[in-house]
From Swiss-Prot:
Cofactors that this protein relies on: Zn(2+)
Gene Ontology molecular function: any one: tRNA-guanosine(34) queuine transglycosylase activity
Catalysis performed (reactions): guanosine(34) in tRNA + queuine = queuosine(34) in tRNA + guanine
Phenotype upon loss of function: Lacks queuosine in tRNA(Asp).
InterPro entries: TGT (IPR004803), TGT-like_sf (IPR036511), tRNA_ribo_trans-like (IPR002616)
Protein name: Queuine tRNA-ribosyltransferase catalytic subunit
Residues making up the signal peptide according to the UniProt record: none
Length: 404
């Protein structure tokens, strides 16, 4: 299946014959993105502690920027003057921006939502400000992101049903306003966002209504907010059962390794999360055998790499063209020197990107079920009793039995 829009061409390259996993090509204005793909989050037009050329060298083809933060600083006028966020941050690959609505509600006190938009108090001087669908799109047009998100009515997944239904229908109406306000469809893609909490009926209604609007891509939002994981997976499964096959599917805010593997199996293509970079700043390294905390003094004299066999520049030896950094060196740096956070972030982002590359390769070879089983075996050190029940149940929905 394929689809074509002025700023996005989409093609399914390969499918898993057992699950809903697939490999796709997403051609965007700043280059080709191959999915499944993980998108690192550069909140304020930078990945904390990492240079654009370092991120590029890791093979990253698309990153996130935050509309709310860029709207505050440097501000829309500066973005217009400099020619958008790509030039502002010296990043010549793709950018996806959120709408700013989530930050309004989650980060700011006394935010209120009406049909007009989100009213909040300015963090600068405390004066009331209103973010409307039109203003969100205007900001994202100034940012120049390759993919921009509609403003949606964001509520917690456990919100009572009447408010959840109101938010779902309002998100549909706000999408219509976003489409009307979008000035640059020839160079920027507007994605809709499926809402509805954990309510299957609301999710189904929202999927069908959003699909009618024919946006270049579709996101599933309102999850990964602390809800029970079985319900999370069932909601993802519900959405991928309905969403069209010929458009990219973006699951917002998901980035734990186990979640990525399961949700690729359930049929999602694109993912983002601050977790890999944020946890790096606390001294935590992501490996195929789980997360290791380099602050632990048992690593004080460990001269091995973060992960044996890892091809990131931190773990590769100097003879292999890397930096040959040891666990002992990380132990001496973490929480003390900014270079430690920089190096750990590079490793963790590489881990995420390599995980997605490995999944793509296994799907193309039609060996994805074996990959999934091997991943959980290694992640849990071969102990099936440690396999999370939510993952076992979710994968059974797509014909993988982890316990067999």
């Amino acid at each position: 299946m394929a689809s074509s829009f002025p700023a996005l061409q989409f093609k399914v390259v390969a499918r898993c014959s057992t699950t809903r996993a697939r490999v796709t090509d997403i051609q965007l204005p700043h280059g080709l993105v191959e999915s499944p793909v993980f998108m690192p989050v550069g909140t304020q037009a930078s990945l904390k502690g990492v240079l654009p050329e370092q991120l590029d060298a890791l093979g990253c083809k698309i990153m996130l920027n935050n509309t709310y933060h860029l709207g505050l600083k440097p501000g829309q006028e500066v973005l217009d003057t400099v020619g958008g966020a790509h030039r502002f941050q010296s990043w010549n690959k793709n950018i996806l921006t959120d709408s700013g609505g989530f930050q309004m509600v989650s980060l700011l006190k006394l935010a209120t939502i009406t049909e007009d938009g989100v009213t909040f108090l300015s963090p600068r001087d405390g004066t009331p400000m209103l973010l409307t669908p039109e203003h969100s799109i205007s900001l994202q047009n100034s940012i120049g992101s390759d993919i921009m998100m509609q403003l949606d009515d964001v509520v917690h997944t456990l919100t009572e049903s009447k408010r959840m239904e109101e938010a779902m229908y309002r998100s549909i109406r706000w999408l219509d306003r976003c489409i009307q306000a979008h000035k640059r469809p020839e160079t920027q893609n507007l994605f809709c966002i499926i809402q509805g909490g954990l309510d299957k009926r609301l999710r189904e209604i929202c999927c069908r209504e959003m699909v009618k609007r024919n946006t270049p891509g579709i996101a599933v939002g309102g999850l990964s907010g602390g809800e029970e994981k079985h319900a999370f997976c069932e909601t993802v499964y519900t959405c991928t059962s309905i969403l069209p096959d010929n458009k990219p599917r973006y699951l917002m805010g998901v980035g734990y390794a186990e979640d990525l593997v399961v949700c690729v199996a359930l049929g999602m293509d694109m993912f983002d999360c601050v977790y890999p970079t944020r946890t790096a700043r606390f001294g935590n390294a992501l490996t195929r055998k789980g997360v290791i905390n380099l602050r632990n003094q048992k690593f004080r004299n460990d001269i091995g790499p973060l992960e044996e066999g890892c091809s990131c520049p931190c773990c590769k030896t100097e003879l292999e063209g890397g930096w040959g950094i040891t666990r002992a060196y990380f132990n001496s740096l973490v929480s003390k020197e900014t270079v430690g956070a920089n190096l750990m972030t590079i490793h963790n982002v590489h881990f995420q990107l390599q995980l997605m590359r490995d999944m793509r390769e296994s799907i193309i070879k039609d060996e994805f079920p074996s990959f999934v089983k091997n991943f959980f075996h290694e992640w849990n050190h071969g102990d099936k009793s440690n396999y999370p029940s939510w993952a076992v149940d979710a994968l059974r929905m797509v014909n993988i039995d982890l316990l067999a």
